[in-house]
Amino acid sequence: MGKAAALSRGGGCAGRSRGLSSLFTVVPCLSCHTAAPGMNSSAFGSGPASKPQLQPVQAPERELLSKQVCQPISEPASRSEPGSQTTSVPRPSGVGQESELQGLWPGSENGTRSVSIIKASPELAMPSPLQSTVGSLPVTKPESKLVPKTQSFLRQGQAKISVGTPVSGIGVQMVSPPLDSYKGWLLKWTNYLKGYQRRWFVLGNGLLSYYRNQGEMAHTCRATINLASTHFETEDSCGILLCNGARTYHLKASSEVDRQHWITALELAKAKAIRVMKTQSDDSGDDDEEPAAPADNSELHHTLKTLSLKLNDLSTCNDLIAKHGAALQRSLNELDSLKIPSECGEKLKVVNERATLFRITSNAMINACRDFLELAETHSRKWQRALNYEQEQRVHLEETIEQLAKQHNSLERAFCNTPGGPASSSKSFSEGSFLTSKGENSEEDEDTEYFDAMEDSTSFITVVTEAKEDRKPESGPGTTTVDWTSADNVLDGASFMPKNSCKVKRRVRIPDKPNYSLNLWSIMKNCIGRELSRIPMPVNFNEPLSMLQRLTEDLEYHHLLDKAVNCTSSVEQMCLVAAFSVSSYSTTVHRIAKPFNPMLGETFELDRMEDMGLRSLCEQVSHHPPSAAHHVFSKHGWSLWQEITIASKFRGKYISIMPLGAIHLEFQASGNHYVWRKSTSTVHNIIVGKLWIDQSGDIEIVNHKTKDRCQLKFVPYSYFSKEAARKVTGVVSDSQGKAHYVLSGSWDDQMECSKIVHSSPSSDGRQKTVYQTLPAKLLWRKYPLPENAENMYYFSELALTLNEQEDGVAPTDSRLRPDQRLMERGRWDEANTEKQRLEEKQRLSRRRRLESCTAGCGGEEEKESDGYVPLWFEKRLDPLTGEMACMYKGGYWEAKEKKDWHMCPNIF
């Protein structure tokens, strides 16, 4: 081995070492017992070095030289490399910034030998990739005072040294660099004129960069290679071939040992880069956008990540040991089969090199195991305390749930035993008197929601008056008087049922919902306070419709708007628009399942011009936050558009869903333009009891042409209320503030309107307005659910048809989403697998867009939206609300007619 190695500066045999990228051990020649540096600087054209005064020594006793020798080093070497200095110091207890070469040298005083301690200049300091793992040959980290626990498997005549990185022949001690980092000089092929030129290469973070010299690192990088997509192999004894598809790089190291250092470092860096790429998430749960976890959880996650990295290091070392062990075994087999004495020298050299490499790698594996064990022992007690705390919290939570269940049952029994039971709905409504005051329920906890009574402008009492008492009701500006006894009254509820002109037969049922039991609390308990759209949920809690289809389902009672087109009075038209806005909540009373979060770029069309007289298009225009744009055109003379962003929070006992964004409705003939927003939905009994949903909050509908207004109030349900559940009340007033109609009903059943004939202040001292009205007229009534609806997710007749397969739709349509289709067919396990695939595909697409934005391919607005541009909608300034909103820019229905969908992305 020593005979075949390049000559060292001292003129002796250069000891060879080959191993992991972190390990640059100076191995003495086995024949002459002189220590050789790990790299020959003359290979790069450096000047000749002085010959160190190293004396030959006698063969030591046959024992492993793994003991720490703490005697002082007495004699310095005569000369050292330029840029370094030679000192003579006693051996410290822990390895510092110098590299030492020491051993048991027979014949020297006290068993010590004069060696050269070389201090590298800062610009020559290079990281040793496996220093943190292979730190005991024997080396300890500067911040650690642990004594190495393993023996170095060195042969007789080998000296034990600290780990450093050879740079032009200089051994430099590093401080715990990462496993996938390395740098040094390599020869790079340039062209046939200049041939191989010396370049400075730096490996880190999965990237290999090179410079002409170290001084260029601060300002000029010649090229950067991404190792995750790079293939590399060895050419000859010192050559390295790198190929990333676009270019091929031919490199040469100074020796086989240095070449092996680089190959091993490249293998580690590539493996880590691929692991990082696979573990990154953006998901319907993007990891890089997740809310910050509590401090304890953050520390635990960091510890687990560190242990995982250590385990990956062990796995990599194990693979390398197996690889080098197999190569060593093959060499030994070849050695046994040799018969010609002339071949023995070359084969013995190969066997010696591989045996040395195997010993070094084995040592690295042992020390990596030691580091992993030490880290695990350090955190074991902390984990035990955390486990005990979690167990105590679980017991406390179970006790709390038991108390809540008892209170729940007690309240239900008390409510059922109340004399007379809950009051039934009537034609007389007293607003604000049924609300529970805080003083009467001071025992409620801090999570209880309190709703104040409406302001005086909307707090009222209605008194029904017979029609014959109405002589000549007053009419405000811009309004007309309606004859309530007329058979053709536009607000006559009997004429509100849509005509059945459907020419296409639609499906009336879907496969029954499978009876899979899954505890919602088991998933949600760790998500308190988080955004609901960022919580990864299995399809078990979904319904086989996307959010785009749920948004389209609001058009089920479109005939209310068709009827409103014919209204000559703007306040009468406002009544129908208000009833339409309330009707969109009627499908939610039993629909506690969560719709699918649409993929970014997903669309849904509803082309029902023949039977419903409208065309509807939805597109998911943003993923975080989830936002959908919607546009509807009706042949009856109205258009509706909106951009809805869903904000949702899990509060422990309930889930709040807050749709953000304005809804626009315009009638082309009259020019009336209505704008309103949605109310807040709340899902109760997340912890215990049956899930139920409620609507709460105020809605103001404004006609921006006439300035008419409608104030709607969704009354939250309360055990202590004597009013009907799910109640909605409202008042329609003109631009002068004069009230014309009173609205009443429930959002899950029906809405009525009563014309006001007289108003006066209340005589009971509460300062509430008393409205004297005519008998109520029916505005809207909910359609009955289809037969067997309880087994079909409580879908309405329209909802059953929304996911029905149709020809000619865009390839991004929700009907073509595979996980949603599998769930509808009852194959939930396959649907969960497919859902994970789609989410990972979406995360990959987002990373690519971010890379393009980083490269400067888009404007500022495009960068803020991670580079995605909607296909059928575009951002515009809404002149009425002053907000930026996505509005339909056209082109979809023309593309459908041409059957040209080449511009659609592949999202499924």
UniProtKB/Swiss-Prot annotation:
GO MF annotations in UniProt: cholesterol binding
Low complexity compositional bias, start-end: 424-437
Main location: membrane
UniProt-listed InterPro entries: OSBP_sf, Oxysterol-bd, Oxysterol-bd_CS, PH-like_dom_sf, PH_domain
Membrane topology: Peripheral membrane protein
Family classification: Belongs to the OSBP family.
Entry annotated with the keyword Ribonucleoprotein: no
Listed GO CC annotations: acrosomal vesicle; apical dendrite; membrane
GO biological process assignments: lipid transport; spermatid development
Pfam families assigned to the protein according to its UniProt record, in alphabetical order: Oxysterol_BP, PH
Region (Disordered): 42-112, 279-299, 413-445, 822-843
Name of the gene this protein is made from: Osbp2
Protein name: Oxysterol-binding protein 2
CDD domains (UniProt xref): PH_OSBP_ORP4
UniProt keyword list: Cytoplasmic vesicle, Differentiation, Lipid transport, Lipid-binding, Membrane, Phosphoprotein, Spermatogenesis, Transport
Subunit structure: Interacts with CCDC159.
Subcellular location: Membrane; Cytoplasmic vesicle, Secretory vesicle, Acrosome
Function of the molecule: Binds 7-ketocholesterol. Acts during spermatid development where its function is required prior to the removal of cytoplasm from the sperm head.
Domain of life: Eukaryota
Residue ranges of domain PH in the record: 179-271
Sequence positions bearing Phosphoserine: S284
SUPFAM superfamilies: Oxysterol-binding protein-like, PH domain-like
